[in-house]
Amino acid sequence: MKNAVICLLLFGICLTVSAQEKVETVSMRYETQNDMPLFYQKLKESLTYPMAWGNSSIRNFEKWREEARKVLLDCMQPAPPVAAFDKEVIDIERREGYTVEKILFNVSEYSRVPAYLLVPEGKGPFPAVLLLHDHGAHFSIGKEKMVRPFGVEASVTADADDWAERCYDKQYVGDYLASHGYVVLAVDALFWGERGRKEGVRYDSQQALAANMLQMGMSWGALIVWDDIRSAEFLATLPMVSKDRIGTMGFSMGAHRAWMVSAATDVVKAGAAVCWMNTTDSLMTLTNNQNKGGSAYSMIIPGIRNWMDYPHVASIACPKPMLFINGLRDKLFPVKGVESAFSTMQDVWKGQSVENLLTTKFYDLPHFC
C-alpha cells in the first residue's frame, strides 16, 4: 500500500512538471518581434507597386503622372476644407537686405497658422522657397529651426540657436536664402512650435495624436502634406512672388515634405530634399529606426504602399528640377536603399529625356549632412 501511494505521488509530480513544461512552451510562442509582425518579409514581398511608372499599364507619361497623383491624393483624403488665406501681419523686423514678417494665415478652415515670411529688399517679383522644417524629435520649435526668431522669449531664441548649430552648421537657412534674393515662407507643422501641445512637449503624444486622427478618418501625415500644399498656394498669391519660380526644400522630415509637396502640386516648380529617401524594403527591417512607430506617423500616408513606394511617389515630380542628397554614414537611411531609390528616379527622369534636371548626391557624412 505504501509503495502504491508513493507511485501515485510520483505520477502526480510528473504530470505537474509536464503541465508546467507545456505552459512554458505555450508562453514562449510569439508572432511579433521588435514591434514587427513575423510575416513582415511576406508583407514586403506582396508589395508590387502597380501604380509605379513602368509597372502601371499607362504608357503616356503625362497621363501616368496625372493618375499617379490622383492615387496619392486619394490616399491622403479627406483634405481639410479650404478657407480664404486672409493674411495678417502681426510683427515685422528689418534685417540686412530683407525684412521678416510674422504673419497669420488660414491654411484651412481648421487652422489659422503663424508663419515667418521673409522678403528681400528691392523690386520683385522674386523667386520663392517654401522652407520645411525637420522632425528631429524636437517639437518646441518648428519654423524657428529655419528662420531666426524675433519677438519671442529668450528661451525660444536659445532653443533655435542651438538647433541651427546642431543641424544647420550655425546657419538659419531661411535668412540665408532671403539675403540672397528669395522670398521665404516657413510654417509650423501640426505638433511643432506654436501648433504644439497645450500641455507641453511629449514625444509619445505624437503617436496618440496620429491614432486619434485616424479614428476620426484623417491621417496626421497626410494633413501635414495638405498644409504644405496650401502653404505653397498661399505663396503663389503674394504679389512679390514670381509664381513660375516657387521651390521647396527641407532636411530630414523636411526633405520628405519637400518631395511629397513637389509630387502633389505643380504650384511647386522645383525641390531640394536633404537626407530623406529610401525604399520600403530597406527601411522596414527589425533594426531600422522606421519600425519604432512614433515619429514615423508624421510621414505615413495610409494605403499608398499598396500603389507606390517612396521613389515612385517622388517621381511624380518629374520633369521638375529636383535635388536629393543623402549621407553615406546616415544610420537612418541605409545606403543600399538610397541607391535603389536614386536609381528608380534616375530611370524616370532619363526616360523623359530630362536627366539633367535630377541631381542625386552622396556625401561621406551622417544624417546631419
Regions found by a protein language model. Name each.
Residues N212-Q215, L223, R230, A270-A314, ...:
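Mobile cap/lid helix-loop segments that gate and shape the active-site cleft of serine hydrolases
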Residues A317, F324-N326:
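Short beta-strand/loop motif that positions the catalytic acidic residue
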Residues A19-T99, V107, G142:
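N-terminal targeting or regulatory segments adjacent to alpha/beta-hydrolase or S9 domains
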Residues Y110-V113, P120-A128, H135-H138:
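Proline/glycine-enriched tight loop/beta-turn segments at coil->beta junctions
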Residues G124, L132-W226, A236-T237, L283-T285:
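Cap/lid segment of the alpha/beta-hydrolase catalytic domain
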Residues M240-G250:
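Alpha/beta-hydrolase fold nucleophile elbow
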Residues S343-C369:
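C-terminal catalytic histidine-bearing segment of alpha/beta-hydrolase fold enzymes
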Residues G250-G254, A258:
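Gly/Ala-rich beta-loop-alpha elbow adjacent to hydrolase catalytic centers
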